[in-house]
């Protein structure tokens, strides 16, 4: 599982559209869909129901969404803390 897969998944769930998520994340829709399919394969579950009207989270997808949002928030916070640390404690040779 990769962070980018979780980003695509969360944005797709928020927008209910793979193509809109791809635009928001400055990627291509085929890459977005492939990342979601890989995530579904890895988790051995279907995360979205797909129809001509768009996409909807499955019950399993709703569970994954809650955890994915939390994971991404924690990654963002970790990066913020590390950046603060670099500013106050620069690495010296």
Which residues are covered by each model-predicted region?
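Short helix-boundary/capping micro-motifs
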Residues: 12-28
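Helix-turn-helix DNA-binding elements, focusing on the entry/boundary residues of the two helices
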Residues: 17-18, 36, 50
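Short alpha-helical "packing" element that flanks the helix-turn-helix/winged-helix DNA-binding module
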Residues: 8-12, 64
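Interdomain hinge and pocket-entrance segments immediately C-terminal to HTH DNA-binding domains
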Residues: 84-93
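The N-cap/first-turn positions of alpha helices
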Residues: 2-5, 29, 61
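A short LG(V/I)-centered, amphipathic sequence patch enriched
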Residues: 40-57
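Alpha-helical residues within the helix-turn-helix
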Residues: 23-24, 41, 62
């Amino acid at each position: 599982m990769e962070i980018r897969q979780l980003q695509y998944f969360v944005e797709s769930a928020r927008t209910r559209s793979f193509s809109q998520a791809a635009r928001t994340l400055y990627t291509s829709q085929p890459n977005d869909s492939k990342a979601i399919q890989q995530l579904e394969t890895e988790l051995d579950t279907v995360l979205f129901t797909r129809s001509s009207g768009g996409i909807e989270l499955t019950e399993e997808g709703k569970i994954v969404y809650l955890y994915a949002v939390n994971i991404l928030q924690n990654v963002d916070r970790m990066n913020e803390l590390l950046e603060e640390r670099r500013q106050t404690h620069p690495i010296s040779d």
